[in-house]
Amino acid sequence: MNCQKCRQPLRLDGSLEDLNPAAYDVLVASASPQTLKKSSVPNPPLAQPQDQSRKSIYDRVSRNAGPPTFKRNHGSHPRDSSMSFVLLSESQMARPTPSSDPPTTPTVLRRASSSKSNADNPDAPMGSEMDRINRLFDVLSARSDVDHPICVECTEMLVEGLQKKLEIASRERDSYAKHLKEAKANKPSEEDMKTQEEALRKAERDRAAAMEELKKLESEKTSLDEELVLLEEESRQLDKEEEKFWRERNDFATRMADFQAERDSINAKYSNDSQLLEKLQRSNVYNDTFCISHDGSFATINGLRLGRLSNKPVDWPEINAAWGHALLLLVTVADKLAYRFDGYDPQPMGSTSRIIRYEVPSPSSSRLGTRAASVPPKRHILELYSSGDMPLGLTFMHRRFDNAMVGFLELVRQLGAFVHRQTEATGTPLSLPYKIDGDKIGDVSIKLGIAQDDGWTKACKLTLTCCKFLLAHASNVTSNARNGGSQ
């Protein structure tokens, strides 16, 4: 057999297998009225007389019935004994009493009855016991809404569901009782009834007064309707005049919008041109062309480092390019200040820039002193770049490059002296930030053969600082000239 809910196979309790015929007949007979009540076609109740002996056996077994075979409680609610098919065997089970009498338990009776039945009917079919059990389960199914048989677990789940339904029904009953009690408590008294009747009569009087007021208002409405007709006619005339006004106003607004669009366009062009002019006036072509800054220990011009350290070796092409930019800066500033170098002709050519030095021979060195003035000056080319093949510290290997850097310092000194003479006349003389004396600038030699790496790098940094000073002076001269021209 299988459980009718979870379809799992069942093992029947031993009490069902050994159920005696008397108890079986009593159970079937007690269930017959319920079965007939559930039938769709009503049948007249059939009288089923019970044998007095069977009745006495049933009463005796019921009095001696012990506890159920399976008994489980859920919380504080005990299980109802009528909700489990297992409890059907309680009518046949009894606790054994300690006695010396021979056993008279239902098991012995069932065995005797079973053996007698088998002896009387030796040809009875083997499935008769199963038919009796199926009949018993059909009776149980007819008495309830649940199909039997069911297992213990499903029975527990069924009992839990019924307990929940019982709790819900109990809460609903309590709620209905509470509402009924409140309704009875809120029943109006005689005084309340009198008060309500008085309020009703007052409301009737107010209603009559309101009806009189309504009649007056209706008469006023009639007169207002006549006045409204006249006002509507006047409104139509005003609508025509308003339409004419808006047509003329829209034409004027269209012309005004065209004029404003043209004005905004002209204003936008003027604003853009003004901003561009102001930007150009504030711009400094010298600072934009020659950006002198620093990168750690190195001075830079346009991002090119000028100097070299043992722990940070700078490539010689970068150094040569930096010298080329610095020489171009001096030439540009000299042209702006209208100054011509004395005895030098700088030729900026990028990484291969050079300085031409003119040496005029002294009169004592010439055999003919009277003709010394006609002798052309001697021309020396100073290369302001190095290939980097020669190591630092060897004086004779860097002589040409050293002479070129000394010549560069001389150009800076001459230009600084010229600026000093010009500004001295205005009362605020300007001088180079560092003093230049031969191959030294600020007591640091610029020659590679004499100075170490850090000394030469420092001398290059001081040189670019002086160049930045000259560049700033040229920018001020340009700004002053522009401001004076605009005034």
Swiss-Prot record:
Residues 283-480 are annotated as: BARA. Keywords: Autophagy, Coiled coil, Endosome, Membrane, Protein transport, Transport, Vacuole. Residues 152-282 form a coiled coil. Disruption phenotype: Significantly decreases the radial growth of colonies under nutrient-rich conditions. Causes only mild infection in point-inoculated spikelets of flowering wheat heads and impairs the spreading to nearby spikelets. It holds the Pfam family APG6_N. It is found in: Endosome membrane; Vacuole membrane; Preautophagosomal structure membrane. InterPro entries: Atg6/Beclin (IPR007243), Atg6/Beclin_C_sf (IPR038274), Atg6/beclin_CC (IPR041691), Atg6_BARA (IPR040455). Its main location: membrane. Residues 33-129 are annotated as: Disordered. Residues 81-94 have a biased composition (Polar residues). It is a peripheral membrane protein. It comes from the Eukaryota. Residues 52-62 have a biased composition (Basic and acidic residues). GO terms for biological process: autophagosome assembly; cellular response to nitrogen starvation; late endosome to vacuole transport; mitophagy; protein transport. GO terms for molecular function: phosphatidylinositol 3-kinase binding; protein-macromolecule adaptor activity. Residues 456-481 are annotated as: Required for membrane-association, autophagic function during starvation and normal autophagosome morphology. GO terms for cellular component: endosome membrane; phagophore assembly site membrane; phosphatidylinositol 3-kinase complex, class III, type I; phosphatidylinositol 3-kinase complex, class III, type II; vacuolar membrane. Component of the autophagy-specific VPS34 PI3-kinase complex I; and of the VPS34 PI3-kinase complex II. Belongs to the beclin family. Required for cytoplasm to vacuole transport (Cvt), autophagy, nucleophagy, and mitophagy, as a part of the autophagy-specific VPS34 PI3-kinase complex I. This complex is essential to recruit the ATG8-phosphatidylinositol conjugate and the ATG12-ATG5 conjugate to the pre-autophagosomal structure. Also involved in endosome-to-Golgi retrograde transport as part of the VPS34 PI3-kinase complex II. Autophagy is required for proper vegetative growth, asexual/sexual reproduction, and full virulence. The C-terminal domain called the BARA domain is dispensable for the construction of both VPS34 PI3-kinase complexes, but is specifically required for autophagy through the targeting of complex I to the pre-autophagosomal structure. This is Vacuolar protein sorting-associated protein 30. It comes from Gibberella zeae (strain ATCC MYA-4620 / CBS 123657 / FGSC 9075 / NRRL 31084 / PH-1).
